[in-house]
């Protein structure tokens, strides 16, 4: 799992930061899942090493323009490029009407199938590898955070050890790989866990924006490996955050601390903290690290690989 930040500014783009979009790359299945799609996202994709042709799912947090204005353009470009990949889009219920209006008035004809789902808190998608769920955040309009949870993978099955024990190949290997206890024809009972290496613990990535500090974000982020959380304002501008229902750097850090995440990555920064101003992003980082040490600042085109943990099968 690799996270690539395509836009890390709030509200408007700057010379060094585009508006919101994050790509979650899943190399093992040659897929990219996109989170938010602000204006100019397709340009950012072209400047990165993320392949547009691998986008299969797009998750939209809310209907503010800096999170959706690039969506129809990206879909249209995918169609013109002849991408055969179907795309599933998840977002607030109003997203369906927005896309229909864009398609109607710009007369876009998509050559690939696009499915749009209005979300509600709970599980949105599940397959053999991942579960994606969402929760309601606290913003001026309905906004949803997303949690991507990878399922645990069994450790490597030791075929050589199984052969040495005289276990015949066949369907029984599948049972042992799943950690089941199997009785052999000769009466021996074999615990599959004894033949498997360390379990690969599933990783969890959480994306929370736009929101002021809220219990919904804490609940969604519980025990996460990586929390991507907005930090629009510095702590001294907390009143602005409360007025506009955005987060400060310290609010993001508090969510990370209470939720027990391993890594906090802050994003969605106000342009008021650009270089040359009295307060700068390094100040926001220092504020957050005073509360939660494992904090870093996102920047456009930064890639973060989510580490995998292994634990011994019991």
Swiss-Prot record:
Catalytic activity: Endonucleolytic cleavage of RNA, removing extra 3' nucleotides from tRNA precursor, generating 3' termini of tRNAs. A 3'-hydroxy group is left at the tRNA terminus and a 5'-phosphoryl group is left at the trailer molecule
GO molecular function, one term: 3'-tRNA processing endoribonuclease activity
Listed SMART domains: Lactamase_B (SM00849)
Keywords: Endonuclease, Hydrolase, Metal-binding, Nuclease, tRNA processing, Zinc
Catalytic residues (positions): 66
Stored CDD domains: RNaseZ_ZiPD-like_MBL-fold (cd07717)
Enzyme class (EC, first level): hydrolase
This protein's record includes keyword Zinc: yes
One Pfam family in the UniProt entry: Lactamase_B_2
Entry keyword Repeat: no
Residues that hold Zn(2+) 1 according to the record: 62, 64, 139, 210
InterPro entries, alphabetized: Metallo-B-lactamas (IPR001279), RibonucZ/Hydroxyglut_hydro (IPR036866), RNase_Z/BN (IPR013471)
EC number: 3.1.26.11
Function: Zinc phosphodiesterase, which displays some tRNA 3'-processing endonuclease activity. Probably involved in tRNA maturation, by removing a 3'-trailer from precursor tRNA.
Similarity-based family: Belongs to the RNase Z family.
Subunit (UniProt): Homodimer.
Protein's UniProt name: Ribonuclease Z
Gene source species: Rippkaea orientalis (strain PCC 8801 / RF-1) (Cyanothece sp. (strain PCC 8801))
